[in-house]
Amino acid sequence: MEPTNGVHQPEEQIVEPATEQMKVAPALLDSTQADPVMTEPLGVAKSAVNGTAITRTPAPERTGQPVIDVSDLRKTYTMGEMEVHALRGASVKIYPGEMVAIMGPSGSGKSTLMNIVGCLDVPSGGVYRLDGIDVSRLTDDKLAEIRSKKIGFVFQSFNLLSRTTALANVELPLVYAGVTGRQRRKRAEESLSLVGLGDRLDHKPNELSGGQQQRVAIARALINRPAMILADEPTGNLDTKTSKEIMELFQSLNRDRGMTIIFVTHDPETADYCQRVIHIRDGLVERDEQLIDHSPEGLRKAVQVL
């Protein structure tokens, strides 16, 4: 994230879960979630940034219970005698199968919102329901369980263990979940194959390109079969060509597996791949923008909304 000017605002640091935080507490939530029906054709849109063609997956129908239901969310940090209001009553709903970008300038509160949605922090006020369960006031152990079962994290810096293979990096969350060695290897191989690295199992991070390292990180995020992925600037360390490949991988996970994917990003090109962009400013949702799918069905829906 970019540094803020003037007073340092803590919300611009997304807290990355420590290794211990990945340990699994007793079962609380059932991570099984039905895939939304994806019957519409893909829509080809033009990037708002450079005019290149982007294939955008049509948004699923917003039916049933939201995966994420944030209502009047507030977060205040105390710094000496000064209070910093990172969130001032933000409200948003995200439904199963959506691919959403959260954008805003430095100090807007978007990273604080991401931390709370990712169960890495708790709000000072308001309610956050994850799959219908109020997680706003859960204990650290139960939040750790939700992180390990329900949420896959992908960060800009990859966060791979440098001395271990791609396979071992992907297996790591299963070690803390108590999964047997044979099952760990089987699931890690499947996860790496899913992201196109089935032939790189024994390679260490320094033997992989930046794009391949991020694919390993995505495979690790998928290993516990989460309900959603939270990605913080996932293409920030990648060149343009590799960024496009990674975003297309995210799209395939969204389209083919019904994965709910949420990005925090400064990059308009990353947002262009999403179906929806939530703009945060001064701790509030300033605008919730549904991007137009240029397939005939997508255009028909856009006209209906208007």
Region locations from a protein language model:
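Polar low-complexity intrinsically disordered regions enriched in Ser/Thr and small residues
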Residues: 9, 46, 54, 83, ...
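ABC family nucleotide-binding domain
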Residues: 64-285
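Conserved beta-strand-loop-alpha-helix hinge in the C-terminal portion
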Residues: 284-306
